[in-house]
Amino acid sequence: MDKRFSASNTPLLAGVVKERTPEAAIEKIRYFEENGATAIDLHLSCFDDEYKTVEHIKRIVDSTDLPMLGLNYSRRYDWTEIEETEEERADLLLKSVEAGIAAVDLLGYSFDPNSRGKFVGEDKYSFTKNNPLEIVTDEAVIEKQKEFINRVHGMGKEVLLSTHPDIPMSGNQIEDLVCFLAERDPDIIKIVTRCNTEDELVEAFDTMRRLKKLNLRQKISFHCCGEMGRTTRLINPVLGSYMCFCTKADDGNRLKEQLDIVTAVNFFKQFGWMDSETK
């Protein structure tokens, strides 16, 4: 199996793993394997501090043949905030790369934490309107992100560049944002906007159709949060989105918008996407 995170020819079903110990993480990964997941989404920050080492992460990576994405959203298992510098947050991602993880999630506000909760740059792009979160336009910060991406590439692994603006955005805005992020040379781009109305839902579907036509080098994953967002997690992969994040149905710390793995697999089977020959 090709363990590159961007290698699949069909949308990935990524099992979300948020656990405190390697043993619990490996058990959850086995559950996802048995129920049809095609990738793993590993929240590194949820581990107890003693397990945030190359050795412990390597145990988890080596436990499966599925491609794995490492994340550090600076939140503990109970989703409370972790106080750490941007360099410390990036260092945990690099530890996972050293441990052999296939790719890491570089948040769009990386190296500029003020951009996490509001837009602080110059409002000169279509996608900087209405106070989007996690969007950086400062060239010095962008250069730091490029350096991180180049470092990961130099270690033979991939980078998913993600941003969660948390506002409704038009297709034009998202298309411009994707092209803007692509200039940093990630391997996958993930954008999560907000979708609360039927009109916004239809716009999200049309946006994904447009993004597919960009024919960029990068794989693109686009879905929404909000009242209507769950539908985009199911339908957007049909329109070209690269990933669907899935959980175990009884997980206490799952996001309400995320689909359970059994539901997602049964849906994806209708398109022949779970057949091994399509991978």
Predicted features along the sequence, with ranges:
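Active-site beta->alpha loop and helix N-cap motifs at the rims of alpha/beta catalytic domains
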Residues: 8-154, 158-159, 166-168
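Short boundary motifs at domain starts and secondary-structure transition points
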Residues: 2-7
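Catalytic alpha/beta core domains of metabolic enzymes, predominantly
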Residues: 109-279
